[in-house]
Amino acid sequence: MAHRGPPSAPKRPGPTAPDRSFQALLPPCWPRSWPLLLLLLVLVAACGAMGRSPQPGRQGPGVQITRLLPAGRTESGDRKDPQARESEPSVPGLGPGSASGPSTDGAPAPGKGRRARAVPVAGAASASRAQVSLISTSFVLKGDATHNQAMVHWTGENSSVILILTKYYHADMGKVLESSLWRSSDFGTTYTKLTLQPGVTTVIDNFYICPANKRKIILVSSSLGDREQSLFLSTDEGATFQKYPVPFLVEMLLFHPKEEDKVLAYTKDSKLYVSSDLGKKWTLLQERVTKDHVFWAVSGVDDDPNLVHVEAQDLSGGYRYYTCLIYNCSAQPHIAPFSGPIDRGSLTVQDEYIFLKATSTNRTKYYVSYRRSDFVLMKLPKYALPKDLQIISTDEQQVFVAVQEWNQVDTYNLYQSDLRGVRYSLVLENVRSSRQAEENVVIDILEVRGVKGVFLANQKVDGKVTTVITYNKGRDWDYLRPPSTDMNGKPTNCQPPDCYLHLHLRWADNPYVSGTVHTKDTAPGLIMGAGNLGSQLVEYKEEMYITSDCGHTWRQVFEEEHHVLYLDHGGVIAAIKDTSIPLKILKFSVDEGHTWSTHNFTSTSVFVDGLLSEPGDETLVMTVFGHISFRSDWELVKVDFRPSFPRQCGEDDYSSWDLTDLQGDHCIMGQQRSYRKRKSTSWCVKGRSFTSALTSRVCKCRDSDFLCDYGFERSSSSESTANKCSANFWFNPLSPPEDCVLGQTYTSSLGYRKVVSNVCEGGVDLQQSPVQLQCPLQAPRGLQVSIRGEAVAVRPREDVLFVVRQEQGDVLTTKYQVDLGDGFKAMYVNLTLTGEPIRHHYESPGIYRVSVRAENMAGHDEAVLFVQVNSPLQALYLEVVPVIGVNQEVNLTAVLLPLNPNLTVFYWWIGHSLQPLLSLDNSVTTKFTDAGDVRVTVQAACGNSVLQDSRLVRVLDQFQVVPLRFSRELDTFNPNTPEWREDVGLVVTRLLSKETSIPEELLVTVVKPGLPTIADLYVLLPLPRPTRKRSLTSDKRLAAVQQALNSHRISFILRGGLRILVELRDTDTGPQRPGGSGGYWAVVVLFVIGLFAVGAFILYKFKRKRPGRTVYAQMHNEKEQEMTSPVSHSEDAQSTMQGNHSGVVLSINSREMHSYLVG
């Protein structure tokens, strides 16, 4: 389980000589709180396409730029014939001309500016709009022509300082060989190259900016031999630096988010150090630390700001989650908030939540801690069976996760949590995903910034990718409405439901750049992205579309993708074409993309590597980074829009717009929200103090403010039931929670819960009057005894830690009788409550039967563990028919998951016998000579690996079997796991009992392995009474079952409201067993009215004629005849037969019997 942030770039081999065709390495993991955010722009040499920035136009604090040699370009490229290098056509909708720069060829002298006047769209602008005036200033970083990477930091916050670090990174050596540090104090008009050590060559690998005080900067330098490193510290935005040596090799630094002088250092040998004086002195905190899994305390959540969360390797080689305070980490032992080992790289600390995962016996479990409480299992739908889980969002006290379920390959399902992040409900299926370098996963979902609750996602169904949008955090999703006309005013002929707008959210071929959808917190409702119109998303189509009302209406603005930058809270939109050829045209809009103008930001076409503005998008100054040719120096062009906006905006310069969804509903997330935007006729600056949110009004609650609670699914059968939530077949809402204590009460869910961040009040309350139930005294259930480490084979005299767990039932009043099999017996209380293991060791080799019996006034449970004591498989499941007849052969099958290709020995224990049956096959056949409950236990041993499972079998004299089948749709949702089959059987039993009033203990439904999904229903007879040899009640029960099945009244709900029908199965269509030694036998018995004695005599003779096969026939009534007919059953699961009657009961009429006899 990992966070969704951009991964580190892989190292690629490069030439030994200086070359710019290197793949940049993204700097170490940068938390969201860091001001130095790196923008990696990759120019892909293979295809000649310019890479896209992680967030094009992302104001920075820091940007890393890599320039590569595009296809078709020569290294000798120079500034000759710029017109030949740029032949960008005029864009429809743009002005008929552009403001021209100096007519002389070549770049201006450093710091020399040019003033230009942009021409707007003809007929679309007022007279004042023709006065757009921009100032472009170009500066060349002389002497850095060989440098192939650049990192940029714009301090912001009323500061005019910009720092640029250029460096030559050698891919083969994996290190920086040359570097230059440049500083500007006038918003990028001029730059000064800094000399850190006069007369000494200094190589800077990286620099880090303190988020709590951006004036404080740390440079990390190294010698060419990588044998020593130094830090250069500045407290005045890089005006001066002081050098301090460090006794280790720095891999990454991590500033404290609130306290400006505290910083963590992760070293190349996986050690973690801390400094409280801005890197002057260091203290070792922890060794064997996992990279990128170190976290400072979260303000407002962790009690002490000096706390550090760490994932580290312990002495045994496993990984643990530790916390410690930086002042006494070495003096006191570390605290382990999670008791057991965790998976490497799984620890994530994010806002109020901590996530981790732990895998044992080939099963992965995901845990969450809310506000540093105890870790609990994340409750996904029972049969989601996740293969992977990615954290999408944790804001607004709610968790969004993407889960790849057992039957998914390149898609994930999106789930939304409750407040504590424990219980999850499905909100969107089949979100497209791609796995990138270093096994990082990219999920095609994007949170629209600036408007809470709005998400875009690309859904992949049947190979088609379509874009959907939600305004209420996933409760409802809609397609994007297409514009009626294109950018030239021509009809698009795109009509729903056959045609919609689809957007590229993320690019699968480059994980180090962001998607092409641009949103900003400072510009709510403004979304600009690349995509196409049609029935699905087309990868090679990158037309640019924009919306200024948060996705309600869209307009096409360009035919090709552009780099986009928002300035002054979206008051100005700047765009530069994303292309591999040099250019000099900047397009911009001052009216939210309705009209566009062009500006020549430089006289000579340049290869654009990136765009940057001051952090916060609050100014009207931007910088274009590029280079004239492959061997030229870096060129920075400052574009200043401030002359066009001479005054600060006032209240009369704004108009308001109301947020609505695609249905025109104003109440979104429980409130009506209005925002301010600048009027198109107002030429003014919004400024730093501008706030877009205008008003909000709380709405009354409606059905649409609620979604289905955990364990429930929304029906999709009809519009009238579209908002109805029904319990899933595996979920019983009346069952008390596992932590329900006697004397307390619990709330039974009605199937609905309000979205956590929804603020509606009054109105409809689907959660009203929840059922308050008293916690009953629960009998112990799910009792387990195991050896810590999940093994059942140990060495003699080795300490063994027995762990007893109880999944359900009261623990305070339960007593536990423990027998370790070698003479040690003891009685415990609170054994499962304390979690303390039982320490023991065995002196002699052998097999020991360890048993634990838990008992209270409500009932008891027993767990058995056979311990093999020798010197020390994975998942094991024992499949056995739960009901069998006396002296009837039954097949016991041990299912190993995964199947072990090596030789495996199976040990079978039946009853309390200590002498097992041994087999090399995973199945054995046996008989039970006496009626009663018999426990069957199997162990699978392969080398020193031993696992076991146990089942209870009911051995009876008489019972009846009814074959069942299900709707074909169930096969699609059948993961073919024993637990799934067991749950389906339980729900069928419960439904039949409710419909027929037959006690559940007299009905047992067994779902068979494999496809198609079929089952057998076992109808048990009541206990025999001395005064009656035969009970007519059994006939009535059977008739009631048949009537309920024939009338199609037995069904249950699957995901999406799919209803599964349970019916009688035609035994002729069931799977056949080759050989037929253990199946049902076809026998027809005629019940002749008035000739009962003759019928009984015939039955008796038939039974005597076929020894070893018994038939039981019952008289039903005069209007209906019954016959019993055993038929052959499937190879993969033993269908049981009763001792004195056959395994299938069929009710037929005279015509059916005649057809059967004749056929």
Curated annotation (Swiss-Prot):
Disulfide bonds join 324-329, 494-499, 649-684, 667-699, 701-760, 708-725, 740-775. Residues 54-64, 89-111 have a biased composition (Low complexity). GO terms for biological process: intracellular protein transport; long-term synaptic depression. Pfam families: PKD (PF00801), Sortilin-Vps10 (PF15902), Sortilin_C (PF15901). Gene3D superfamilies: 2.10.70.80, 3.30.60.270, Immunoglobulins (2.60.40.10), YVTN repeat-like/Quinoprotein amine dehydrogenase (2.130.10.10). Residues 75-88 have a biased composition (Basic and acidic residues). It is a single-pass type I membrane protein. It is found in: Cell membrane; Cell projection; Cytoplasmic vesicle membrane; Early endosome membrane. Residues 50-1078 are extracellular. Residues 786-876 form the PKD domain. SUPFAM superfamilies: Oligoxyloglucan reducing end-specific cellobiohydrolase (SSF110296), PKD domain (SSF49299). Residues 1-49 form the signal peptide. BNR repeats lie at residues 182-193, 232-243, 273-284, 468-479, 545-556, 587-598. Belongs to the VPS10-related sortilin family. SORCS subfamily. SORCS2 expression is decreased after the onset of symptoms in mouse models for Huntington disease (HD). SORCS2 does not interact with wild-type HTT, but does interact with mutant HTT containing a long polyglutamine stretch. This is VPS10 domain-containing receptor SorCS2. It comes from Mus musculus.
